[in-house]
């Protein structure tokens, strides 16, 4: 439990710093992309804050996890809005067969996760990850065909794919190894997710300059 607390404190710190830096960037530049990134980090931090405080006060994981989930779901919604905001009209209308890898990979995982947990929660989370991944793959393929600053969007799309992939890894590991000690793959998958969340800040900065 102590390692889970340290892990959640680290995630809370990363999201708080991300929100702070995004807010500073928004204040300096006035770009709406930074405001949306601030909302992403802020909502994720609120979810992590509830989880961390519960661990501190009661030395156990929250029984009512929906409180944190509201914050985390909201953060992913803001990430999707950010993704749509940064995409050009040509990118949004770009047709890419490889983007269908997202549902081809995500739907079987959804069926698998539903055997372990709440069906509605899994539908919401996997649906959002499939949507994010679909748009990220399409955007990455589109950006690879561009020249100059437009190619900087690749970093953002890769960052979103790393975030979605880390979420999938964490959920899958949690099904087999619910323990959160450093000996468990779940612990390291959660650390990987924290790094992916942190990486979205420089990736967004590069995309804004595209």
Predicted regions and their residues:
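Hydrophobic alpha-helical transmembrane segments of multi-pass membrane proteins
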Residues: 10-21, 33-57, 68-76, 156-176, ...
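Internal transmembrane alpha-helix with an interfacial aromatic "cap," most often the third helix
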Residues: 18-29, 51-101, 137-140, 200-209
């Amino acid at each position: 439990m102590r390692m889970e607390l340290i892990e959640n404190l680290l995630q809370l710190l990363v999201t708080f710093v991300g929100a702070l830096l995004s807010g500073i960037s928004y204040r300096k530049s006035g770009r709406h992309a930074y405001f949306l990134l601030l909302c992403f980090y802020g909502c994720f931090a609120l979810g992590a804050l509830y989880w961390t405080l519960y661990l501190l006060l009661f030395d156990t994981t929250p029984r009512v996890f929906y409180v944190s989930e509201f914050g985390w779901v909201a953060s992913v919604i803001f990430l999707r809005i950010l993704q749509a905001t940064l995409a050009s009209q040509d990118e949004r209308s770009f047709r890419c067969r490889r983007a269908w890898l997202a549902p081809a990979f995500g739907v079987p995982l959804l069926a698998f996760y539903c055997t372990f947990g709440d069906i509605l929660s899994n539908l919401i989370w996997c649906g959002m990850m499939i949507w994010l991944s679909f748009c990220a793959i399409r955007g990455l393929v589109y950006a690879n065909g561009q020249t100059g600053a437009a190619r900087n969007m690749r970093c953002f799309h890769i960052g979103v794919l790393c975030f979605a992939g880390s979420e999938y890894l964490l959920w899958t590991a949690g099904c087999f190894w619910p323990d959160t000690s450093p000996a468990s793959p779940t612990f390291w998958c959660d650390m990987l997710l924290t790094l992916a969340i942190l990486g979205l800040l420089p990736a967004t900065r590069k995309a804004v300059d595209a």
